[in-house]
Amino acid sequence: MKRFLVGGIVCVLLMLPFLSSCVISKTGGEDGFHYPAPALLPGTTSAMNTPGFWIGIHPDPDRVVIPAEDLEAFNRTIRKETGVIQDPSSFPETFQGSRISGAAQGSLRFISSRNYFRQDGTRADAEFFSGIQEQMNLSAIPEEVPVRLALVTSYTHQRILPTDEELYSSMKSTDLDRLQNSAYDIGTPLAVFHATRDGRWLYTITPLSEGWIKAEHVGYCTREQMVHYLNAEPFVVTTGSKTDLFLDQGLRRHHAYARMGCRFPSRDTGSPGVIEALLPFRNEEGKCVLKGAFVMAGQVSRGYLPYTPRTIILQAF
């Protein structure tokens, strides 16, 4: 009898983890192990979820941390001394072809050595990369490559290789596309050096990176046009995470959106709450033409925002 009692207790103890998981699953996620995050963390209040709370406890929220002229000088120093940020409008008339072909070939060589997965779960094999290399047509790059300047006319992705197909390090991390290099908003300046065999992709250098961008997303311009557009005044700067751009003053014909920090030449519309921004468009010949688009006044700043604690807090929220 004692032996049966001990055995019963052992069985109950062994079953407790499984029984507890059944109870947990009623309040947890579908698998019983994931829980919704609490609305408030310990030691916090709901007021802390508003910018006003933090502005209210700051001793001097409207103090200018760095004046605008000092910020401009700082930016010039960054561009000049680090070389991290490039200015396509100041590029020479030509680049050495080996510089462009070497960079493009190096990217292909690196990616093809990583054993990445394709979207269908198969490995990206030699046949896959052979097709891409054929499209890259790097042998057509001359010794001296003419620099063609352009502006981005549609929000676009810059790819490490000229393809829309995504590659993953594993099928458990499909949220990270290993071929995505960057993304650029309307109005971004860039230089074009080469096109794929089918003409759909362009090898480009932007202020921050280089890679392949779809040809249909850029409009070619002269150096003078680029400099004028980038420095035109008055201008507005987008302040929302995504600022909607419309083709009509009534804000009904949606064109695109621009992320925070985009600068566009502007002019008043005469209508309260609406501002006209000048955007680059691509015409049938592939050239850049400037046309007006319209934004809500509350989603942009006339000129750059002042560098104050209030500004930083508001933008963070």
Listing of model-derived features with the role each one plays in the protein:
Residues 9-18:
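Bacterial N-terminal signal peptides
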Residues 28-159, 165, 175, 205-243, ...:
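Boundary regions of SH3-family modules and the immediately adjacent low-complexity/disordered segments
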Residues 81-83, 92, 105, 173-196, ...:
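Conserved beta-strand/loop element in small beta-rich adapter and peptidoglycan-binding domains
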